[in-house]
Amino acid sequence: MASNFTQFVLVNDGGTGNVTVAPSNFANGVAEWISSNSRSQAYKVTCSVRQSSAQNRKYTIKVEVPKVATQTVGGVELPVAAWRSYLNMELTIPIFATNSDCELIVKAMQGLLKDGNPIPSAIAANSGIY
């Protein structure tokens, strides 16, 4: 099986403001991707897979999205992150799930966050579900 620890486009903004993250670390079973921005302004993704029980495998996915800003210190403009938003997702899959079962789970995840659906619409509008 080919490695899936490769760079990918995290934010697809029609090519003009795309954010690509590249592999940066893989230690203790945790894969980390980071954007090329300065460390304080970088987008970061981590993913780990653990055996959560004899019957289940647990994926833990975390995404950090920075609010990019600058700060002037001593007449020098420095890049900083004004704040960060964090996404944490846990996915538990029975070890006896087939590849087609897992493909269906991925399709459900993609549908969950598809543009125009209620959850991403609420997040994009900084509002609730109503």
Swiss-Prot record:
| Region described as Viral RNA-binding: spans on this chain | 32-105
* Presence of the UniProt keyword Nucleus in the record: no
Where found, per UniProt?
Virion
Annotated GO molecular function terms are: RNA binding; structural molecule activity
Q: Which cellular components does GO assign to this protein?
A: T=3 icosahedral viral capsid
> Keyword annotations for this protein?
Capsid protein, RNA-binding, T=3 icosahedral capsid protein, Translation regulation, Virion
Q: Does the keyword RNA-binding apply?
A: yes
Which GO biological-process labels does this protein carry?
regulation of translation
Subcellular location, principal: virion
Its biological purpose is as follows: Capsid protein self-assembles to form an icosahedral capsid with a T=3 symmetry, about 26 nm in diameter, and consisting of 89 capsid proteins dimers (178 capsid proteins). Involved in viral genome encapsidation through the interaction between a capsid protein dimer and the multiple packaging signals present in the RNA genome. The capsid also contains 1 copy of the A2 maturation protein. Acts as a translational repressor of viral replicase synthesis late in infection. This latter function is the result of capsid protein interaction with an RNA hairpin which contains the replicase ribosome-binding site.
What family is this?
Answer: Belongs to the Leviviricetes capsid protein family.
Question: Quaternary form?
Answer: Homodimer. The capsid proteins form dimers that assemble by group of 5. Twelve such pentamers are linked together with free dimers. The homodimers binds to the viral RNA via an operator hairpin, but also to many other RNA sequences in the viral genome; this interaction probably shifts the virus from the replicative to the assembly phase and ensures specific encapsidation of the viral genome.
**What is the protein's given name?**
Capsid protein
| Organism for this UniProt entry | Enterobacteria phage ZR
